[in-house]
Swiss-Prot record:
Its main location: secreted. Keywords: Calcium, Disulfide bond, Hydrolase, Lipid degradation, Lipid metabolism, Metal-binding, Neurotoxin, Presynaptic neurotoxin, Secreted, Toxin. It catalyses: a 1,2-diacyl-sn-glycero-3-phosphocholine + H2O = a 1-acyl-sn-glycero-3-phosphocholine + a fatty acid + H(+). Heterotrimer of alpha, beta and gamma chains, each related to PLA2. Preincubation of this protein with monovalent antivenom or suramin prevents or delays toxicity, respectively. Antivenom fails to reverse neurotoxicity when applied at point of 90% neuromuscular blockade. Treatment of this protein with 4-bromophenacyl bromide drastically reduces enzymatic activity and toxicity, presumably by alkylating a His residue at the active site. This is Phospholipase A2 P-elapitoxin-Aa1a alpha chain. It is found in: Secreted. GO terms for biological process: arachidonate secretion; lipid catabolic process; phospholipid metabolic process.
Length: 27
């Protein structure tokens, strides 16, 4: 879903690597 995808992008940008919302929902 788009909301989860948005979280994924935000987390990935923060960590500079792929981070999935179900692994790091808090970023």
């Amino acid at each position: 879903n788009l909301l989860q995808f948005g979280f994924m992008i935000r987390c990935a940008n923060k960590r500079r690597r792929p981070v999935w919302p179900y692994e790091e929902s808090g970023c």
